[in-house]
Every structure is written in C-alpha cells, then in structure tokens.
Amino acid sequence: VHGRIRATCGRVLHAPIDPDTLGSALGDLVARPRRDIDSIGGRSPAMLGVRAMLHRYADVDLPVLITGESGTGKELAAHALHELSRRRERPFVAVNCGAIAPTLVQSELFGHERGAFTGATVRRMGLFESADGGTVFLDEIGDLPLEAQTNLLRVLQEGTLERVGSHRPVRVDVRVLAATHVDLDAA
C-alpha cells in the first residue's frame, strides 16, 4: 500500500515545510498532466466494463446517479466523468449531502443574499454558482432534505436557482452527478 501511495504522489514533503518548497511542489502538481481514466483500477472484466461506461456517459450532458456500496469508488467515478467531459477545464465541486447541517443546506448549495438570515452579512454564492460551467457532485444524495430536493429539481429542469432571501432566478450551467450507497427506490 505504501508503495502504491508513493507511486501516485508527485513529491513527498516532510515537516517543517519551507514555503518555497511548497510553492514549487504545488507548481509541479498544477503542471502535471491530468490522470487518464485508463490508469484507474484493475483489468478485471468488471473494471473494464465500468471504464467503458464512464467513457460512454462522459459527454452525455445529463445528470448521472452512481450507486454502490461505501468505498467502491463512486467519487472516483464522478471525477472521471468530469475529467472525460467537455467540462473538464471548469470546476468540479463535491459535497457530501449528509455532512451539511440541515439548517445550512439551502445556503451552502444555492447561496444567500445579505440579510437573508441572522449572520448573513454579505451575499454568498452557493456551490452550484461556484461550479458554473463545470460539475457538481452530490455524494449521498439520499440525505438531502426535501426542501433542497425541490430546489435541486429546479436546477435540473430549468438551469436556474434562487439564493436564500431572493426571488430573482440566477442562471447556472452545471452538470449534476450524484451518488448513493442505498437503494433510493426502497428508501
């Protein structure tokens, strides 16, 4: 495992890290070519089938639901779909829907206006706006509260959202990828 991790690293830095060394390492990382999907995973028939499916759906600019048990690489598949798509030069924004406090979900995903609630001292873009032109990955989509699901539907159907505290639609161009480890039909 240690060798496999080391093989995927660009450079190993040891603490304390000199700022110039860190800057150089980050520059090398940015300049490095993006990872090719064919280098991911094994050569089993199942993995070859997964890779073929990722290639097939990468440029289909529709939402994709990725299902599977925890730890099976759903986020890796989402990254691959983004990297293989025409949106690869734009942001990839991932969020675990179960990790956001229910009271903050709307603001985190869709943004808010100044004064929309106590503590909202400035207008803030949500994750969808920050990913404009790119991809939003909603991990554990089944944990998304019902009210946020309604607003997500608007993004999917109309390509617009409303920030919390506003009634003015904001146009967004994002591809939505979602993942879950549960059977959503049975949930």
Protein language model features and the residues they cover:
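N-terminal accessory segments that target, anchor, or regulate ATP-driven/P-loop NTPase machines
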Residues: 1-35
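AAA+ ATPase active-site-proximal loops
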Residues: 34-171, 176-183, 187
